[in-house]
Amino acid sequence: MTSDSFLAPHIPVLLDEVIEALSPVEGGIYIDGTFGAGGYSRAILEKADTQVIAFDRDPDAIREGASLVEKYKGRLRLVNDCFSNIGHHLDALDIKTVDGMVFDIGVSSMQIDRPERGFSIQADGPLDMRMAQAGLSAEEFLNNAQEKDIADVLYLYGEERQSRRVARAIVAARPLTTTFQLAKVIRQSLGYRPFDKKDPAAHCFQAIRIHLNRELDELKDGLQTAERFLKTKGCLAVVTFHSLEDRIVKHFMREHAGQTGQVSRHQPVIPQQNPVFFSKPARPVRAGETELARNPRARSATLRAVYRTETPFSEDISRPDTHIPRSRRQSA
């Protein structure tokens, strides 16, 4: 994508709903934790005379976003880093609070649509899958890891119940160097047929990508940052695309809004002892038929939003653990 093409409108999923939740105000400061092609940042900047600090660990996104920085002179700052490090950068800028944050979790359309990045099962390319284009690649991991470690990744992050079978097939097929090679091995190991409804390669690719990029750990850290920096009534809006991410976000928002629930519906609710940092979460929002017709990738998207309460942030306060849920026991 060239700098000129980057200026062309890019509409991320649930854009109207995200902007409605954020409700940008004049003079506000907003964080776009996952800049990508700049769709959310652009919409925030167009909605009101605001400032946006946008983060992306992918150097391609930062480089190609330079045209937006030029267009919105002095109002958009791009940072080549993970959104888990937002706090470090805000501290360096001496910014104490912000008016809103948006996180669009997972791989971007830009990354999927470029075969050379190795994220897609639809086009052949090198086994890469690194968002930051640094660190361990998918090729290095799959060709060197123990079979058990590969199986664990597929099971935990792809919820693949036949993960051991797939891992055995991957080890037997080494060396693997391309996305088509890997997809073929996965499909053959699970007896996939072209007319089957779901392609098992999709969630196995997802699992490997999540592992390599530490996506769930990054998500947990980013959510904690929002608690610290959002001002009273500031919005945290998070868009997720699969159940692992969504469960983490849902649990975080409920627990930090004081909704710890109860062990059984027949037992009384235990009074909440921890401070309440967020309002009661709104109902999750999903794409309507009009958006789905325009962008089929929005089908799995879920938006959750909460608003910061007046409770002061303190490092000394004990907080609920935003755990990564484990799936049921796998079969061989």
Swiss-Prot record:
Matching InterPro entries: RsmH, SAM-dep_MeTrfase_MraW_recog, SAM-dependent_MTases_sf
Domain of life according to the entry: Bacteria
**Localization terms from the record:** Cytoplasm
Q: What is a single cellular component term in the Gene Ontology annotation?
A: cytoplasm
Q: What's the EC number here? A: 2.1.1.199
Enumerate the GO terms in the molecular function aspect. rRNA (cytosine-N4-)-methyltransferase activity
Instruction: Please give a single GO biological process term from the UniProt record.
Output: rRNA base methylation
One Pfam family, please name it: Methyltransf_5
Q: Where is this region: Disordered?
A: 309-332
The record lists S-adenosyl-L-methionine as bound by 38-40, 56, 83, 104, 111
Record Gene3D superfamilies: Putative methyltransferase TM0872, insert domain, Vaccinia Virus protein VP39
Q: Which reaction does it catalyse?
A: cytidine(1402) in 16S rRNA + S-adenosyl-L-methionine = N(4)-methylcytidine(1402) in 16S rRNA + S-adenosyl-L-homocysteine + H(+)
Q: What is its main location?
A: cytoplasm
Point out the coiled-coil segments of this chain.
none
Q: Which keywords label this protein?
A: Cytoplasm, Methyltransferase, rRNA processing, S-adenosyl-L-methionine, Transferase
Family in the record: Belongs to the methyltransferase superfamily. RsmH family.
- State the function annotated in the UniProt record: Specifically methylates the N4 position of cytidine in position 1402 (C1402) of 16S rRNA.
The protein in question is named: Ribosomal RNA small subunit methyltransferase H
Natural source organism: Zymomonas mobilis subsp. mobilis (strain ATCC 31821 / ZM4 / CP4)
